[in-house]
Amino acid sequence: MLFLAVFCGFLAEYQLEHVIENQREKQFMRSMVEDLEKDIAGLETESKLVKTQYDKLDSLTEMIYEGDLSQFQVTKMYELQRRYLYPLTLKLINRTELQLTNSGGMRLIRNKQVADSIIYYWGITELLYDTKNNINVHRDRAKDISFIIFNNKYYKHTEGFSLGFSLDPSKGEPALMTRNPAVLSEFANRISHMSDLLKRNYKQGRVDHQARNAKRLIQLIKKEYHLE
């Protein structure tokens, strides 16, 4: 009888732990879905911004390659390089990933298909960051050359952050610091390469692909864990 009582107590404790683990697992999956929904919003916004960015950078390179730099084109070049030659800063949500790491890792997710899909998603996120960082290196090199071509004195200097980057009329019509064909061509070549990377490697190959991954993963989690 004593053995039976001990066994029943052990069984009840085991069942309680099992229920608690199930609840924790399901809570992690709810948290993961919330993260993914935020990721989708961020990725879709990034996709639109990046398309505008590489379209405008393509316009800038076309002006340089055409070679007929009128005052109108020079003014437009000042606007485009300042407004669209910016670094990529996308950061996806890693809240649930950190929580799982601090709680014992993926062993808490006992559904193998879901666990494998989450690990795959996180792996693609790291590849996305690698691509982003690589493009930012090319951007930095192009930006270094821009300091030889464009004179910042023609821009309005305002306190705090501004998306306007307006030209200052009091400084007169903006002029290029150099019209050296080799310098301008290198600048255009670097921007053209950056634009191609933005279009194919980053937007199509990473951002749009990861948005689709996030949507599929949400569907899988909701199906396997019976979430609304």
Where are these regions (language model features)?
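Long, hydrophobic alpha-helical segments that serve as membrane-spanning/inserting helices
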Residues: 11-228
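Hydrophobic membrane-insertion alpha-helices, especially the h-region
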Residues: 1-11
